Amino acid sequence: YKYFPKTPIELIAERLPRTLMLFAMVNIVSFYTGFLIGKILAWRRGSKSETWITITSVFSYTVFYPWFALMMLWFFGYKMDWLPIGKFLYPEKWYDAPFDSDVIFVLMIKFVVIVSVIQFFIYMFTRNIESLNTKRNLRFIGLILNIIGSFIFWNTGDALTKKLYAMDIAYHMILPVFTVTVVAFAGTALLTRTTMMEVLKDDYILTARAKGLSQRRIRDRHAARNALLPVVTSFIFTIV
């Protein structure tokens, strides 16, 4: 009877925006980080860095999650006092707020989705460019424009009045997002490493090397792309 007279649907709807925000941030960051680390591990197989990163990934993948979360809370929240331990905001800052926290969560979700879509289209637009320097420059320019657009978004119009509240929520999200990302990226990294090591044995990789293609191009355009399918499939099943 703690939440009476609210119905279960009302309670779920009340907490859904903050759940979706955390879910979106963790999945985007962990998938990108895991895939990036995984392809580097496969490419540098046999090296000392590959050994240590693989051991770290296996530890993250097999660690007991409740214990690890408590250790993160103890170290970053209690011992170092860098990050807040409980709740998702400071109640005293929201006492006179003209809107509910869910409004800020919805705005932050929209912002993350828009920025992610823009970066995806920048990547798709530049991926077939032959010149590595041109590709890097265009992606860097796209990133700068995205950052400028984000700054304008949060400093103009209706979002300006909500910026401080969004920063409060974002500050409280650092620790949970980081903690879940550390344990979530490992599965993607290990799967990417395994599938890419199989791909590197294929004949077309040997052909690409014989044609004199750069190591980066062989890794990113030939090996990593073909290793991506099972990784994306696993990622989709994880979301579902």
Question: Residues of each region from the PLM?
Answer:
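Hydrophobic alpha-helical segments of membrane proteins
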Residues: 24-28, 32, 67, 71, ...
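Transmembrane-helix boundary motif in ABC transporter permease subunits
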Residues: 26-57, 69-74, 125-130
